[in-house]
Amino acid sequence: MALVSVAPLVSMRRSLFSSPYELKSIDKTIPNLVMCRKRMSGTPSIRVSSTTSASNDDGVRRRVGDYRYNHWDDDLIDSLATSYEAPSYLERADTLVEAIKDRFNSMGVEDGERISPLTDLYQRLWMVDSVERLGIDRHFQNEIKSALDYVFSYWKEKGIGRGRQSAVTDLNSTALGFRTLRLHGYPVSSDVLENFKDHNGQFTCSGIQTEGEIRGVLNLFRASLIAFPGEKVMEEAEIFSTMYLKHALQKIAVSSLSQEIEYLLDYGWHTNLPRLEARMYMDVFPQDTIYEQKLVELAKVEFNIFHSLQKRELQSLTRWWKHYGFPQLSFTRHIHVEYYTFASCVATDPKQSAFRLGFAKMSHFVTVLDDIYDTYGTMEELELFTAAIKRWDPSLVDCLPEYMKGVYMAVYDTVNEMAKEAEKVQGRDTLNYVRQAWEPYFDAYMIEAKWISSGYLPTFQEYLDNSKISFGSRITILQPILTLGEPLPHEILQEIDFPSKFNDLISVLLRLKGDTRCYKADRARGEEASSVSCYMKDNAGLTEEDAIHRINAMVHNLLKELNWELLKPDCNVPISCKKAAFDICRIFHHGYKYRDGYGDATIETKNLVKRTVLEPVPL
């Protein structure tokens, strides 16, 4: 798809990423908490949309969202059972891991080169790509590095063939090699793809569309998605390969290849979830050799062993959800199960339990607080809650209205508990740092509440400066990554967290993408300000369709910048932590793939929960 000119946006690029947490002046008056036990006024100061209002038991007329209740029956979650915790499955997995390590090692020069020098490069790349896409790569990190070091030692400006002694370069091997090496931090240039153009500077194909050619173009498509800013050849590769693959789907029979193409065209890279891809890939993976069969068997056994862990974690999350009274909050979205599913689709190492549960809880907070601040709460209640959070004092819970008390204590207890969990890894108390991250988040919410109350529509830049904070991506990322097992000194943490460009890119991307999916529903609830409406305000005469088109073009370009911030060489930040933050960005991007996947569980989201959490894979 061709890129769109975004000339009106160029002038705001410099301010787009400057001082993201420098808030504009707002009324700083804090309610007197000593007097807060007095009866609260029954008159809200937020404007009410007549189409989305309801009278609560307290007599206050409030705006409410049109949300459905929890889609997942608690009894169903409590009754989840699995036999894959049995020692026999763990033992089988260990046996398969050793067999596959032997296969990796058999490709080494020191072992006599049991594979041909005409295919040795592609065989190594195929093995690395296979274990990664099947979701079992955590067992083979040393083997992966050894294989890629070998491939890189034969990398040339014109690409590679299938083997080190191949006479000609090969698109499939080169595209797969380029993608895999770049993702693993090797310094490879996209200029290598120029060698697969014709004399007119165009990517070409034979027209026959053999399976080998199709797979080559498929890997070209995969490679094109990890483009850096300014890489024109990657844009051209994406356009060419997308058109080619869509055309191929119309010609080839339904097969494992067609299913693979459909999946990759659908989810690409920035909306792909590794566990979902693994679930798809094990269904279409070839099993013609004993080693291919062992790869698939290990993937399935590991999938189901992890499924047994998911069961326990999901049951724990449900108990937490009930303990703090969230089921009684009928005005808000109940999508904690979905958030846990998303987390377990990107963090598949059993050791990352704190990350998965932490992300699910933080995301649930962001959702509930969004519904309170944007829709349900009165200005007086919001000021009380904000002041109480900033004081970080549980005794102040008595000052809050009933529906806020459980939310306050859930935030207070969970943030404190996660700080203790992080201290085991970081060797220092991070609570104060985390609290400082929460404060601008609530300040941003208060600004939006005042916009809603007064009917004020800000400029696009004013809106973005504030709303990229209120989106809450920093809240959902910060504490989970502190539990990952990698010590992050303060100066390193700030290269992932605020004030890094990496953090800001994620915040801006998700706000822009989310608004293109949510702005109509938000407007119906009385929330006029969105990137779409504010952009239209700044550009009189522009239609909604044009505004969305231009914002999507912004997102497309910003994704390239995010690729660079993630993969740029000579970075001090552990790639595992940066990748975890990037994966959280992919989670939210995935939810906005077709529509607002967080306003209500979509068919796609429900299928995701069933396919990756509730149902084991048949062995």
From Swiss-Prot:
Q: Name one GO cellular component term.
A: chloroplast
Q: Where is this motif: DDXXD motif?
A: 370-374
Its Enzyme Commission number(s) read 4.2.3.117, 4.2.3.121, 4.2.3.119, 4.2.3.120
Which Pfam families does this entry report, sorted A to Z? Answer: Terpene_synth (PF01397), Terpene_synth_C (PF03936)
**According to its UniProt record, which cofactors does this protein need?**
Mg(2+); Mn(2+)
Q: How is the cofactor bound?
A: Binds 3 Mg(2+) or Mn(2+) ions per subunit.
| Catalytic function, reaction form | (2E)-geranyl diphosphate = (1S,4R)-camphene + diphosphate; (2E)-geranyl diphosphate = (1R,5R)-alpha-pinene + diphosphate; (2E)-geranyl diphosphate = tricyclene + diphosphate; (2E)-geranyl diphosphate = beta-myrcene + diphosphate
Q: Which residues bind Mg(2+) 3?
A: 522
Q: So, what pathway does this thing act in?
A: Terpene metabolism; oleoresin biosynthesis; Secondary metabolite biosynthesis; terpenoid biosynthesis
Where Mg(2+) 1 binds, per the record, is at 370, 374
Superkingdom: Eukaryota
* Positions of Mg(2+) 2 binding: 370, 374
Kindly give the InterPro entries that the UniProt entry links to this protein. Isoprenoid_synthase_dom_sf (IPR008949), Terpene_cyclase-like_1_C (IPR034741), Terpene_cyclase_plant_C1 (IPR044814), Terpene_synth_N (IPR001906), Terpene_synth_N_sf (IPR036965), Terpene_synthase-like (IPR050148), Terpene_synthase_metal-bd (IPR005630), Terpenoid_cyclase/PrenylTrfase (IPR008930)
MF-aspect GO terms = camphene synthase activity; magnesium ion binding; myrcene synthase activity; pinene synthase activity; terpene synthase activity; tricyclene synthase activity
Localization, per the record, is: Plastid, Chloroplast
Task: Please list the GO biological process terms of this entry.
Answer: alpha-pinene metabolic process; diterpenoid biosynthetic process; green leaf volatile biosynthetic process; terpenoid biosynthetic process
Known role: Monoterpene synthase (TPS) involved in the biosynthesis of monoterpene natural products included in conifer oleoresin secretions and volatile emissions; these compounds contribute to biotic and abiotic stress defense against herbivores and pathogens. Catalyzes the conversion of (2E)-geranyl diphosphate (GPP) to (-)-camphene, (+)-alpha-pinene and (-)-alpha-pinene, and, to a lower extent, to tricyclene, myrcene and (-)-beta-pinene.
Q: Which family does it belong to?
A: Belongs to the terpene synthase family. Tpsd subfamily.
Instruction: Name the chain's protein.
Output: (-)-camphene synthase, chloroplastic
The scientific name of the source species is: Pinus contorta (Shore pine)
